[in-house]
Amino acid sequence: GWGGGAPASGPYGGPGVGASGGGAGEWAAFTHGADTPDAANFGEGVEIRLPDGSVVMAPNAAAAAAVRHALTQLGVPYQWGGTTPGVGLDCSGLTQWAYREAGLNIPRLAQEQDIGAAVAPGDLRPGDLAVWGGHVAMVVGNGTMIEAGDPVKLSPIRTSNAGQGFQGFWRPTA
């Protein structure tokens, strides 16, 4: 996360931030579960029901649990340095808490959450992390990710974030 508040034009605010110029549309085909070519590499996977009622397949139980926990925080206010579920979270506070609840300890700072295995954009699965130099978000499936904006919200998957350097997509459970 960043210091200060979260102005509408800042890294967390405003509809469509970072999703223009070939953003959301090209991601729509990813994370469709068992019909993806690499699904065999993950076995059956673990189902997750998203807020819209659709079902996606996480690669394993830890990733599924992390996504389920993260989704419970939708609407929670952004708080710089925040690590308290239901009260206030920053970006890395959200992802660290969700994975800790799933039994996996990951680093606190966003830019240090590029752990596990690097994942190609075409191989994204629920629970994978999108990591920037000062922000992190978690892929939930169907072309969306959850992130601590103001408040915690679902956004289209993207690789740009207010000019921050993108460190890639990562699977902490790999």
Language-model features, listed with the residues they occupy:
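Structural motif
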Residues: 127-128, 135
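Intrinsically disordered, low-complexity
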Residues: 1-77, 166, 172-174
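Short acidic-hydrophobic sequence patches enriched in Asp/Glu that either
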Residues: 62, 90, 161-165
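Aromatic- and glycine-rich peptidoglycan recognition patches
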Residues: 108-112, 116-120, 134, 140-174
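Catalytic cysteine-centered active-site loop
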Residues: 74-126
